[in-house]
Amino acid sequence: DRGIYVIIDWHTHGAQYNVGAAKDFFGRMAQKYGHYDNVIFEIYNEPLQVPWGEVKGYAEQVIPIIRSHSDNLIVVGTPTWSQDVDKAANNPINAHNIAYTLHFYAGTHGQYLRDKGNYAMSKGLALFATEWGTVNANGDGGVNYGGTEEWLNWMDQNKISWCNWSIHDKNEGASIFNPGGSLSESGKYLKDILHGSAPYAPWR
């Protein structure tokens, strides 16, 4: 009723080594929760230096398990910390209601990564930024306001859904809470973005 979605995520860097466990997990999750239309399945959060062919092969084994219970959106990670959506675009998965993961951190990643996204979309792929941060790719550092603005505008223009990293009180820049629970610099900024009050929120 409140427009909230839930992502059931296999949060790993090596899902291709645990296909059996992933099939069992997503089979049970899809059977139990797949009838809710606000549930999304992310079957491989962030492959590292894994060839796209291996990621695709893993996905082609897990997707049918979910589809036996649910037609909901399935999100598939891409190589190199879920950045190489261009490689997925050249050899996409033959399945319906699939999106591909694009991860970025505004302090590290810029136009070259958006160019990969533009290429993937030009080939017909749907993208979902299931992890992005306002800081550097190591999860730390100060908020890069200019870089975040560029990414927010690009995602808004291309109707790309996103999830910010992270709801955590770890002592690092990406956490939206400081240790102890007060909002961090990134947390304050994200709150302003979500409320549409930040000057960098394209939907304000």
Task: State where each predicted segment sits.
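Extracellular glycoside hydrolase catalytic/binding regions
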Residues: R2-Y5, V19, K23-I40, Y44-K170, ...
